[in-house]
Amino acid sequence: MFRRGKLSFLNTKDDRVKIINERINITERHLMEMCSSFALVTRKMAKYRDSFDELAKSVKSYADDEEINESLCQGLKSFTNAVTIMGDYMDINVHRLEHKIVNELAQFEQLCKSTRDNLRLAVIARDKEVLRQRQMLELKSKFSANNSAADSELFKAKMEVQRTNKEIDDIIGNFEQRKLRDLKQIISDFILIAMKQHTKALEILSASYYDIGTIDERDDFIEFQKLMKTKEELASRKTALKKGLRSQSMDSLEHEHLVSPLKRRPKLSRSNRNLTGAGINHGSKTEPEDETDEQDEEEDDEDEETEQSGEEDEESGTATDDEREPTQPGNQVPPRENVFGAKIRSASKDIATPSTSASATSAPSKPSRQTVKHPFKAVASTHVRLQKQFHVPQH
């Protein structure tokens, strides 16, 4: 730009400007990287604070649901309070980092930009004064007779160059001083913030550690064993009660099964009662209750025979009163008719041969049982007989 032989002082000034420009660029690049790193730390701490809130919530939920271990419940509640307070301090630290660290570092971008612009303007002003000083020197060398005006202009140019150089020095010095002061303050603030956080956390964690140490494992385990014993006793009582009820029901069922079916007294339904009231006998047991096993077997055989005969009568459906009525002696009362027009059957088997009657008188008499048909089968056969008697057409 200028010849180094005549204006040698300009070389040193230009070197200083070059150095300060490099310093500004380095400072801006590294401080912006530090700002982004501190911002990342702040965001991570905010997530860490949210994680502490979730941890406190889960521990509190377990402490509320715990009902047996009392000391454990108290220790968990103390730990929940400690975690909650630590989360609150983390929230305060997040706000402090945002205001005192990240925002302060972000201002260095504007500082570097303004310093670079001021330095450029100062260098331009200095170059103008240097050019003017060069012109005055050339004019003085050409017109050596009248040098008073040239000397005064040259002096003014020199003063302007000195002023611009001083301004450049002030810009460079102010930038360096502010950079050093602000960086020192920012790093100190970060350290103090971390120390306060860890100091409070140490106090809280110390108290929580003492509370956790007061958990009595033995007493809690004894309470658990007592609860289990009471639960087992209640369960055993319930099972014993169920077994007792079941045994009673089974005994009653077994008693019902042990009783002979012949000794059971069947309950008459409404139809059976009507038939009995109409004159149709369902059957009567004339045997005493202390019958032997042989009599029971004979009665079972007779019941089977009567059932078979009743089935045959129902299938044929052509029996009449003359066929069914046995030959009765003359001294017997004539049979009555029921509401259906049927005659009552004889209650005992009177039809017998003389030999059988003689043997019956000689042999010990056994209680005879009436051969009774099923009431519903008797009704069916009577109905068929009445249809034939009154010539009712069948459908």
UniProtKB/Swiss-Prot annotation:
What keywords were assigned to this record? Answer: Cell projection, Cilium biogenesis/degradation, Cytoplasm, Cytoskeleton
Biased-composition ranges, Acidic residues, are 288-324
Expression tissues: In neurons of the second and third antennal segments, expressed at the tip of the dendrites.
Task: Report biased composition (Low complexity) as residue ranges.
Answer: 352-368
Q: What Pfam families would the database entry show?
A: FAM92 (PF06730)
Q: Name one GO biological process term.
A: cilium assembly
What changes when the gene is disrupted?
Answer: Viable but displays adherent transition zone (TZ) assembly in sensory neurons and spermatocytes. Consequently, adults display phenotypes associated with ciliary dysfunction and disorganization, such as reduced geotaxis response and decreased male fertility. Some mutants also display, reduced scolopidia cilia number, deformed axonemes, excess accumulation of material beneath the ciliary membrane and deformation of the ciliary membrane. In spermatocytes, some centrioles are undocked and display irregular distal ends or microtubules extending from the distal ends.
Where found? Cytoplasm, Cytoskeleton, Cilium basal body
Q: How does it assemble?
A: Component of a ciliary transition zone (TZ)-localized complex composed of DZIP1, Fam92 and Cby. Interacts directly with Cby.
Q: Which family does it belong to?
A: Belongs to the CIBAR family.
Quote the PANTHER family the UniProt record gives.
CBY1-INTERACTING BAR DOMAIN-CONTAINING PROTEIN HOMOLOG (PTHR21223:SF2)
> What is this protein's name?
CBY1-interacting BAR domain-containing protein homolog
Gene name, per UniProt, is Fam92
